[in-house]
């Protein structure tokens, strides 16, 4: 025994991996082991057969089929299971990897014994795996599932996030050059997409080898298929024409939303949040027929492809989001319509109380030594009269629009039938319109305050004998005349005395504007929640984690030491690692980081301190994740017609 051990230790010991289905092969079975030889060191066991002739007939029948959903041609017999002696079949077996497996009880592990066809001593790794069921949309994957269309043509390459991602990929490629390549016979090198694809096909191959080939082909069934197919064709044609009609209406609305009267001017999407929301929903509606046809072809051809699963999850996640959005919208719409008078009265009170009266009272209060501050009376009265005039003009305009308030509330309520997101977008637009006077006062005060700071900074440079060189973008020394210094001193003194008064009014209007922007940010957060929440993915994660994998998890089960008639065997469990909550809400966290980095960033704080206007977050940053699930160029009406009636090639493949 010691001599054998020494010889084995001196010789190079190979490691072979056998992927064993955990639930499909029982200890009571016996016969030949059928599977794939992925490589010299990787064997995938699928099932057992009792007769080689039936297996040969199965290969002949299915190899004639051109539209194969699984890899049948490379199937072979890998060895025997619970057989007393090695019985070599015909020519469809692998002599260099022939294995002899025994399993005595249900709780015991399968043991691989030495045979004459395996002269070398090897170490075995038997990996138990659960064959994923394709009809239940189960599959294994090495990488987390992505809901985005990861194609170069669909990615905005001008986005800073894309540039950062490209930079990280370049660094990773350079980092790999500093490390030697691993050996082929290692876990890192053996786990490849081809092997995972074979594991995904194992369940369907087992069902094909054990299925009953008796098919009902009587005249009654043929007649029923003929009548039902003609009936379905008639209704499908009507439905296809209806989809094309809706596509034409969508195209007209999309052209109106994206129309620019003058090149480089603003369109409706750049001005209104509701227009952006309508554009998103119509773009999704244009892409849904393409997604549905791809899924229909996928189910008809019985293909097993991870990309089809991703398309399935993307499609139904959008449908569930839109369905829940409409449910919430109809609920809110019914509540508003039932309490129309109360809602109208509440809106009028809020608008005139907080947006008009309180702002007007604040401006008047700033004239009379606010918080004990002694301000310049003349400047205070001038700014106060100008601000009150703007507020009164806007108040009179709102009073003229007051009879239209019930109608506008009804419009917002009816928009809820298009989804709660559209209602929230309209509320955000109405809030922006109702507070135009606050925005104008904030812009005027910020411009005045920023201009005053710039002039004071320039006068400080004058006292230091410096002058800004605009052509070279630097500060050079300069000798000023006496009259220039005297005039600069007078202007500096006047501006310094005016600065507290200007700053107080600017701070008041900036605080009011920040309050309005906070309300708009809340609306944007709610829109992001309704547009990006992974509802369908969360339901799949709770119902069946195998449908949203994010990798593989290997766990050591047992170890059998080296024996005289066997091999040193390590038993492992290969389980699909479901997608974590962090990965599911990764896009949501990106949106939260964008909102926080925009409104609570250092740049925003500095802009408020120096009087630079703080704009709202760009719509591209708020919606680009949802648009990433859509193609950049929507399908044309002609291609949609060809796809529905002639089933031509998909435009986004």
UniProtKB/Swiss-Prot annotation:
Biological process annotations from GO: GPI anchor biosynthetic process
Cellular-component GO terms for this entry: endoplasmic reticulum; glycosylphosphatidylinositol-N-acetylglucosaminyltransferase (GPI-GnT) complex
Chief location of this protein within or outside the cell: membrane
Gene Ontology molecular function: any one: phosphatidylinositol N-acetylglucosaminyltransferase activity
Places the protein is found: Membrane
InterPro entries recorded: PigQ/GPI1
Mode of membrane association: Multi-pass membrane protein
Pathway membership: Glycolipid biosynthesis; glycosylphosphatidylinositol-anchor biosynthesis
Keyword annotations of the record: GPI-anchor biosynthesis, Membrane, Transmembrane, Transmembrane helix
Membrane spanning residue stretches: 43-63, 237-257, 327-347, 382-402, 407-427, 485-505, 520-540, 605-625
Record function comment: Necessary for the synthesis of N-acetylglucosaminyl-phosphatidylinositol, the very early intermediate in GPI-anchor biosynthesis.
Protein name: N-acetylglucosaminyl-phosphatidylinositol biosynthetic protein gpi1
Native species: Schizosaccharomyces pombe (strain 972 / ATCC 24843) (Fission yeast)
Taxonomic path: Eukaryota, Fungi, Dikarya, Ascomycota, Taphrinomycotina
């Amino acid at each position: 025994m010691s001599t054998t051990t020494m010889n084995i230790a001196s010789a190079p010991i190979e490691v072979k991996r056998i992927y064993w289905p955990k639930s499909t092969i029982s200890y009571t079975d016996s016969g030949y082991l059928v599977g794939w030889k992925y490589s010299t060191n990787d064997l995938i066991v699928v099932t057992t057969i009792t007769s080689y002739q039936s297996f040969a007939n199965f290969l002949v029948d299915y190899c004639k089929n051109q539209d194969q959903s699984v890899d049948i041609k490379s199937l072979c017999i890998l060895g025997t299971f619970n057989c007393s002696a090695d019985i070599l079949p015909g020519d469809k077996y692998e002599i260099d990897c022939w294995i002899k497996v025994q399993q005595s009880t249900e709780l015991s592990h399968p043991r691989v014994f030495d045979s004459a066809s395996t002269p070398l001593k090897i170490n075995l790794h038997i990996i138990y795996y659960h064959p994923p069921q394709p009809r239940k949309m189960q599959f294994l994957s090495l990488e987390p599932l992505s809901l985005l269309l990861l194609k170069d043509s669909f990615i905005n390459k001008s986005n800073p996030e894309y540039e950062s991602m490209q930079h990280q990929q370049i660094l990773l490629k350079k980092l790999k050059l500093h490390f030697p390549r691993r050996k082929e016979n290692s876990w890192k090198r053996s786990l490849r997409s081809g092997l995972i694809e074979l594991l995904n096909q194992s369940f369907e191959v087992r069902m094909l080898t054990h299925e009953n080939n008796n098919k009902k082909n009587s005249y009654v069934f043929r007649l029923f298929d003929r009548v039902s197919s003609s009936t379905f064709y008639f209704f499908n044609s009507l439905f296809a024409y209806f989809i094309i009609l809706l596509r034409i209406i969508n195209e007209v609305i999309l052209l109106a939303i994206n129309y620019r009267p003058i090149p480089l001017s603003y369109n409706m999407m750049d001005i209104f949040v509701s227009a952006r929301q309508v554009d998103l929903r119509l773009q999704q509606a244009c892409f849904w027929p393409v997604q549905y046809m791809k899924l229909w072809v996928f189910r008809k051809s019985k293909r097993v492809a991870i990309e089809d699963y991703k398309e399935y999850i993307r499609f139904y996640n959008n449908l569930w989001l839109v369905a829940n959005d409409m449910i919430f919208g109809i609920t809110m719409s019914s509540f508003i319509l039932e309490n129309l008078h109360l809602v109208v009265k509440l809106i009028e009170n809020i608008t005139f109380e907080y947006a008009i009266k309180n702002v007007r009272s604040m401006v008047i209060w700033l004239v009379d030594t606010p918080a004990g501050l002694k301000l310049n009376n003349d400047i205070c009265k001038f700014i106060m009269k100008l601000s009150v005039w703007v507020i009164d003009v806007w108040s009179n305009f709102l009073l003229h629009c007051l009879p239209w308030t019930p109608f506008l509330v009804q419009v917002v309520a009816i928009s809820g039938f298009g989804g709660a997101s559209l209602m929230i977008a309209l509320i955000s637009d109405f809030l922006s319109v109702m507070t135009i006077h606050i925005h104008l006062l904030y812009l005027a005060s910020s411009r005045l305050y920023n201009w005053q700071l710039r002039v004071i900074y320039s006068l400080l440079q004058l006292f230091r004998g410096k002058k800004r060189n605009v052509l070279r973008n630097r500060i050079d020394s300069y000798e000023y005349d006496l009259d220039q210094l005297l005039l600069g001193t007078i202007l500096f003194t006047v501006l310094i005395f005016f600065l507290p008064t200007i700053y107080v009014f600017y701070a008041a209007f900036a605080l009011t504007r920040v309050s309005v922007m906070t309300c708009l940010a809340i609306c944007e957060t709610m829109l992001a929640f309704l547009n990006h929440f992974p509802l369908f993915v969360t339901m799949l994660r709770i119902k069946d984690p195998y449908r949203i994998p994010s990798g593989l998890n290997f766990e050591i089960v047992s170890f059998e030491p080296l024996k005289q008639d066997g091999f040193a065997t390590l038993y492992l469990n290969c389980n699909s690692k479901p997608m974590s909550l962090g990965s599911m809400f990764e896009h949501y966290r990106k949106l939260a980081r964008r909102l926080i980095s925009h409104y609570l960033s250092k740049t925003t704080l500095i802009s408020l301190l120096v009087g630079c206007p703080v704009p709202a977050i760009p719509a591209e940053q708020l919606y680009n994740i949802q648009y990433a699930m859509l193609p950049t160029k929507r399908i044309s009406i002609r291609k949609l017609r060809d796809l529905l009636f002639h089933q031509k090639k998909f435009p986004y493949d």
